């Protein structure tokens, strides 16, 4: 493969990002690439060994994400941001997300590495409530609605308990006028 953009430049001095941009520009808008295919073409162009590519791969992926000229198109496909208008980018991202919503999600079974086949051991991760897809039906839901009749019966029961302690006959009647006279005497 030959890239005209780098004519006259030393191939060993080129970065993987520069080569990726040139490869995508040469292929054009209708030919977005999977990440693995892009890395393979970069490796072939730069003539790097598998070990060198494996070492540089995390750095390249980080650069690909942070460089503003690349855009992820979903399903691990990449393209150049200059290929898409701003409105078109949002639409493509939204349509990719909408397509994923229709697929049912499968629950993966967790394996506890520490269980080691011991049948008597208790697996505490098995009772995690966040793992359950339990939805309570509306008929199962009970509400604590206050009933005014309950309040009346509570007051009556409270009164009856008080009467057991102090019978009503023992209550002393208080005349409010007497208290007022006593207050007047104290003021003088």
Curated annotation (Swiss-Prot):
Family: Belongs to the RpoE family.
Domain HTH HARE-type: 14-83
Name of the protein in question: Probable DNA-directed RNA polymerase subunit delta
A single GO cellular-component term on record: DNA-directed RNA polymerase complex
InterPro entries in the cross-refs: Asxl_HARE-HTH, RNAP_delta_N_dom_sf, RpoE
Region (Disordered): 119-188
Organism: Streptococcus equi subsp. zooepidemicus (strain H70)
GO biological process: DNA-templated transcription; regulation of DNA-templated transcription
Protein function: Participates in both the initiation and recycling phases of transcription. In the presence of the delta subunit, RNAP displays an increased specificity of transcription, a decreased affinity for nucleic acids, and an increased efficiency of RNA synthesis because of enhanced recycling.
Molecular function (Gene Ontology), one example: DNA-directed RNA polymerase activity
HAMAP family in UniProt: RNApol_bact_RpoE
Keywords: DNA-directed RNA polymerase, Nucleotidyltransferase, Transcription, Transferase
Quaternary structure and partners: RNAP is composed of a core of 2 alpha, a beta and a beta' subunits. The core is associated with a delta subunit and one of several sigma factors.
């Amino acid at each position: 493969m030959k890239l005209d953009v780098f004519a006259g430049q030393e191939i060993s001095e080129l970065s993987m990002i520069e080569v990726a941009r040139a490869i995508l520009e040469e292929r054009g808008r209708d030919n977005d690439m999977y990440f693995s295919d892009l890395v393979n073409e970069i490796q072939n162009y730069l003539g790097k060994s598998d070990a060198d590519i494996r070492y540089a791969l995390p750095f390249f992926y980080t650069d690909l994400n942070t460089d503003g000229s690349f855009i992820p198109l979903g399903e691990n496909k990449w393209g150049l941001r200059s290929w898409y208008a701003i409105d078109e980018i949002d639409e493509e991202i939204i349509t990719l997300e909408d397509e994923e919503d229709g697929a049912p999600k499968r629950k993966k079974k967790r394996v506890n590495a520490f269980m080691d086949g011991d049948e008597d051991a208790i697996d505490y991760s098995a009772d995690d409530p966040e793992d359950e897809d339990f939805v309570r039906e509306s008929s199962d839901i009970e509400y604590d609605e206050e009933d005014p009749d309950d309040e009346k019966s509570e007051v009556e029961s409270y009164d009856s308990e008080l009467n057991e302690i102090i019978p009503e006959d023992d209550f002393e009647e208080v005349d409010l006028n007497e208290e007022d006279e006593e207050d007047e005497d104290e003021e003088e």
